[in-house]
A protein has these predicted regions:
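Beta-strand/loop-rich accessory regions of lumenal/periplasmic or secreted enzymes
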Residues: 1-251
């Protein structure tokens, strides 16, 4: 993305991201046929998206430029960008998924080492998990970049993770500001992914960059897998198309 002759390396999206706990079989339950399943209950396997780009449509609509990318044979179906004269970009996207999933949505890439801070209107100041939604408050929050390790460092609130009820979020970087307005009800904004400690006793999550997620993972404890952490920790059964809308501004 270029802004006033400056380059903001926000790219490679939208791309579908979907993952489930690596010890699961296709029916969500523990995979007894896998001899190494027990070793995988702290890791997540990402679904490869076989989507193939088929067509690009470009048209003008009321002074706006509308660019639609169409895909087939995979999860991502369509990404429609509406660009207005001020440089605001509205993304309407559609993807499909049928099956059991612990993490699902769309993602973009941005180099983490360029991030300075974030400010957002939404639930905060803490990140959430599927089984730890409650306890946040809806307000304007702000924090500097940090990358704490549970049990080893005590920097709070954590910068990275999944954030709920986000109306808008501004991510300040060394290259400029990435601003997004979330118009997808019940979607979460993912800011990279939480990092586990040295021994990886809790989770090893797939890299998700800056993401808009319909499903976020639960968190386990050191003893029990997520299956044993209550009803809110169970994976989601998803079937059919999923749609969303997010507006980007780059400053």
């Amino acid at each position: 993305v270029s802004v006033d002759n400056r380059k903001i390396n926000f790219a490679n999206g939208p791309r579908f991201i979907g993952a489930r706990r690596a010890d699961r079989s296709l029916d969500q339950f523990y995979n007894h046929d896998d001899e190494k399943a027990k070793e995988k209950d702290r890791t997540y396997s990402e679904f490869p998206d076989a989507a193939v780009f088929t067509k690009l449509d470009v048209k003008e609509d009321g002074g706006n430029l509308v660019v639609t990318a169409n895909y087939k044979l995979g999860n991502l179906d369509k990404a429609q960008w509406t660009i207005n004269p001020s440089g605001e970009l509205a993304l309407d996207y559609t993807y499909n998924f049928s099956g059991v999933v612990d993490l699902m949505g769309i993602r973009f890439d941005y180099p983490e080492d360029q991030v300075i801070s974030k400010r957002w209107l939404g639930a905060g100041p803490y990140r959430v998990w599927q089984n730890r939604i409650h306890g946040t408050q809806y307000d304007v929050w702000e924090n500097d970049y940090n990358d704490p390790i549970p049990g080893e460092t005590f920097t709070y609130p954590e910068f990275k993770g999944y954030f709920g009820d986000v109306s808008w979020m501004n991510i300040q970087t060394k290259e400029g500001t990435i601003s997004l307005t979330n118009e997808t009800p019940d979607a979460y904004i993912g800011v990279y992914q939480p990092r586990d400690g040295r021994d990886r006793l809790l989770y090893t999550l797939p890299e998700s960059g800056i993401s808009v997620l319909n499903v976020i993972p639960p968190v386990r404890n050191k003893v029990n897998s997520t299956d044993l952490c209550g009803p809110s920790s169970q994976p989601k059964w998803v079937n059919g198309p999923q749609t969303g809308r997010v507006i980007f501004r780059f400053m």
